From Swiss-Prot:
Gene3D superfamilies: NAD(P)-binding Rossmann-like Domain
Protein name per Swiss-Prot or TrEMBL: UDP-N-acetyl-D-mannosamine dehydrogenase
Subunit: Homotetramer; probably dimer of dimers.
Binding site for UDP-N-acetyl-alpha-D-mannosaminouronate: 160-161, 212, 216, 219, 250, 252, 263, 323-324, 409
Gene assigned in the entry: wecC
Species annotation: Methanococcus aeolicus (strain ATCC BAA-1280 / DSM 17508 / OCM 812 / Nankai-3)
PANTHER family, per database record: UDP-N-ACETYL-D-MANNOSAMINE DEHYDROGENASE
GO molecular function: NAD binding; oxidoreductase activity, acting on the CH-CH group of donors, NAD or NADP as acceptor; UDP-N-acetyl-D-mannosamine dehydrogenase activity
Positions with a binding annotation for NAD(+): 21-22, 41, 46, 93, 131, 331
Source lineage: Archaea, Methanobacteriati, Methanobacteriota, Methanomada group, Methanococci
Protein's UniProt keywords contain NAD: yes
Role, per record: Catalyzes the four-electron oxidation of UDP-N-acetyl-D-mannosamine (UDP-ManNAc), reducing NAD(+) and releasing UDP-N-acetylmannosaminuronic acid (UDP-ManNAcA).
Active site location: 212, 266
Domain of life: Archaea
Length: 438
């Protein structure tokens, strides 16, 4: 969609604060549409990298988009904001521990708001994309109005994209835009309409905040149900994957897949923002705690299984540490806690992940993680793992001390591995585990 030149006169400059997974693609997209964009990030190294035309995240198509935005002269990146007509805040909102579990830490959002306050003028529009608890936009708006005396517009428009497919979803996905008032929502809609092909739905800011939290909480609660089914199935000698497949034949049933836990910057965090906003969020809290406990359950299952098999101080290859398949993102990954538990119980761990770049523990080659190992533990469903062929598996079998595979995401072609003499243990398949209950 091309930029309406009449609107370009109204909005001469946009300042995007936070140049991470969401901010950088958004800033680049707006610049390509013809807006003058100032991209701001407090990380000097990140700003330098972007200025040099290099990627800070591995995202398909982003290099081309970023290069076009910079060479057009429409995108300039800095460490400090400057006067603009629109400010879009795309900074992290992590969760920190509190008495109820976890709570939203707004320090980055509030810092971003404070940094732009000196540049605000009457008629400016502030848009928050960061995930925040209900009523946060209202509170920030009231604070700005009280402490600056400026008559501004303000809206909340949460991102709704999947790492690994950000640019496509940034353009094609529907968006919810919540304004402090109708004029704020309408102004924000005009900005997003310049590049979004999906539908744009207008509401108030508090509803929009809740919408984002509901989307991710829905998935978290349903994953918790699947994980509980996996635990029960293990106890009852049932294969949960077969049971889920058959249950989903019902036209009104769609059970999600179980796994070793929930990770990423959204689903594992956002439900806590509802829990912290209401005492009635009992189911949400229980589901979140269940998913948070899955890494401990998985690690305990592994530890006890090795004891039952009589293998002491086992060496295991951990295959996959990112929070989901085919991405490099390790934020909130359940693999972290699983590895911690194994190391605390005298396991020797060698980690291989074809996507991850940085992690708390050393990353090794695939050969290093296989050689002389007692088992391979698959925690992430990368395509590379799914595509292991007969000859690959045969070669792997010759390198290992014991032929054991533990598949926590139902990633592998189990028949191929069993043909090569592997003992395959699948999360949620009671028949494959010696240990049934913890």
């Amino acid at each position: 969609m091309k930029l309406d030149k009449s609107k370009q006169k109204e909005i001469n400059k946009i300042c995007v604060v936070g140049l991470g997974y969401i901010g950088l693609p958004t800033a680049s997209m707006l610049a390509i549409q013809g807006y003058k964009v100032i991209g701001v990030d407090i990380d000097e190294e990140r700003v330098k990298t972007i200025r040099d035309g290099k990627l800070i995240i591995n995202e398909q198509g982003l290099m081309t988009l970023l290069t076009g935005a910079i060479t057009s002269g429409n995108l300039v990146v800095k460490t400090e904001p400057e006067e603009a007509d629109v400010y879009i805040i795309c900074v992290p909102t992590p969760a920190t521990a509190d008495k109820n579990g976890k709570k939203c830490d707004l320090i980055c959002v509030l810092s971003a708001v404070n940094n732009i306050k000196p540049y605000l003028k009457d008629g400016d529009l502030i848009i928050i994309e960061s995930t925040i608890p209900p009523k946060t936009t209202e509170k920030i708006y009231d604070d700005i109005s009280k402490n600056t005396g400026k008559n501004i517009y303000m809206a909340y428009c949460p991102e709704r994209v999947l790492p690994g497919n950000i640019l496509k979803e940034l353009v094609e996905n529907d968006r919810t835009i919540g304004g402090i008032n109708k004029k704020s929502a309408q102004l924000a809609k005009e900005i997003y309409a310049s590049f979004i092909e999906g539908n744009l739905y207008i509401t108030d800011s508090t509803t929009a905040e809740m919408v984002k939290l509901m989307e991710n909480t829905f998935r978290d609660v349903n994953i918790a149900l699947a994980n509980e089914f996996a635990k029960v199935s293990t106890e009852l000698d049932i294969n949960v994957w077969d049971a889920i497949n058959l249950a989903n034949k019902h036209p009104r049933v769609n059970i999600l897949n179980p796994g070793p836990g929930v990770g990423g910057h959204c689903i594992s965090i956002d439900p806590w923002f509802i829990v912290g906003s209401s005492e009635n969020a009992e189911l949400i809290k229980k589901a979140r705690n269940l998913n948070d406990d899955m890494p401990k359950y998985v690690a305990s299952l592994i530890i006890k299984e090795f004891k039952e098999m009589g293998i002491c101080n086992p060496k295991v290859g951990i295959f996959g540490i990112t929070y989901k398949g085919d991405v490099e993102d390790t934020r909130e990954t359940p693999a972290r806690a699983i590895i911690d538990y194994l190391l605390q119980n005298d396991f020797e761990v060698s980690i291989y992940d074809p996507y991850a770049k940085d992690f708390e523990y050393p990353l090794n080659t695939i050969e290093e993680s296989i050689k002389n190992s007692d088992a391979l533990i698959f925690l992430t469903d990368h395509s590379e793992f799914k595509n292991f062929e007969k000859e690959d598996i045969k070669e792997i079998s010759h390198m290992m001390k014991n032929k054991i595979v533990m598949d926590m995401k139902n990633t592998l072609n189990h028949n191929l591995w069993e043909e090569q003499g592997f003992n395959v243990k699948l999360l949620g398949d009671g028949k494959s585990w010696i240990v049934k209950t913890l």
